[in-house]
């Protein structure tokens, strides 16, 4: 495939053009009075969104070079989304402002490498300052404020997420599901819950609700497939003598063994229920070990030299109550805190050591099931389009609250960045010289871009509002929803420090890369063939096949 090569100013200008298009599409959503963007979908109804990274992912331009610019700035948004889960629009607006300002200086003859060094040093200074100004999140009121702002000023959502965080703790997991009703509901599960139900509906003890509820049961955990009932007979006899119910968690139970269990259950000889083991492969083994730790039992596995036919009562776990439906199993156990704590600590260390975000997420889920609990928010809405929009907003809100708990909160609405601009200016004048100083000044001028855009989206003059905010104390900023200057902490307009920091770092990184670009190589567009009219081969020429 032939390539097109563009050098110097032309290359940078083409990138800038693509960035302008993307930044404008994303920036319209910024702030409490930001608008929505409608995305056409190949199948199904159009999607209405207010989420920066979702919009950025949709934009593809015809011109390959401009499209490269789009891809670069999109990276700033998605990297921020990966790191903090929110702040994607801010990252896009910041990156765009830095590139605009920087290109002006490069065109005037400044050295891009020196500018990049200045940008990097300024960013490092600002990151330290953001950490200094961050306040730790102590109460659920602050969590509710962060969540409400992130969900588009929805206080009800804020309260719901704060409530969920309260119930499941910092280690807990809050997941989203599409609800069946118009209202958004919160459901918190006590104990460990996994997505496997009973193997046979005959195990249900409550036929009306089709669930099996076993109080004070023994728990047999094994990673092997149970094929012969003879393997189970010794342990079943011991459990029957003890007069307690039994829950079997195994890879699978073949028909013959299953039939025997069902017959015993129906005749009332033994109250028993069987569940397939959750997960796959190594993850299944780890989850079975988690269940064994929680219930103070052992995993009966040949890896440890244990066989089912030799199993003793003291190898079985005990639970306070186990509830099994056709889709999931919930184990509520108590009294084994020490072992559970040690297991949680082990999982935490694994989380710190792993680089894969997927593994991190799965380990976090395991930790939540052991330590805190799991909250499910069922998102309700009148139409599917609204449901998707709400789900995206809620996702942002959950991520923002987690980020706030990690690194604390700072004044929101672009205020922190505007107040840090004079501090950066003074520091740069003292510590930097020449073109590095110009690089720091590029960052300093870009810091006001998010607030300026928030004000413009609210129909105000952005430049005037930025100047007025600069004159006020650090915690005071502009509330675009009410059009007044307020203490941002008192008004509940706060951002997680992690979100502000990630947006700034990723914007500076992309800006530095664009400014130091001297040449672009892209595919040459293929010439379009002009088919003579009506030359559709055999079938009607109007259709795409």
Curated annotation (Swiss-Prot):
GO molecular function, one term: unfolded protein binding
Keywords of this entry: ATP-binding, Chaperone, Cytoplasm, Isomerase, Nucleotide-binding
PROSITE patterns named in the record: CHAPERONINS_CPN60
Residues where ATP binds: 29-32, 86-90, 413, 479-481, 495
GO biological process, one term: protein refolding
Gly residues bias locations: 535-545
Substrates-to-products reaction catalysed: ATP + H2O + a folded polypeptide = ADP + phosphate + an unfolded polypeptide
Cellular localisation: Cytoplasm
EC number: 5.6.1.7
Subunit: Forms a cylinder of 14 subunits composed of two heptameric rings stacked back-to-back. Interacts with the co-chaperonin GroES.
HAMAP family the UniProt entry points to: CH60
Protein name: Chaperonin GroEL 1
Gene: groEL1
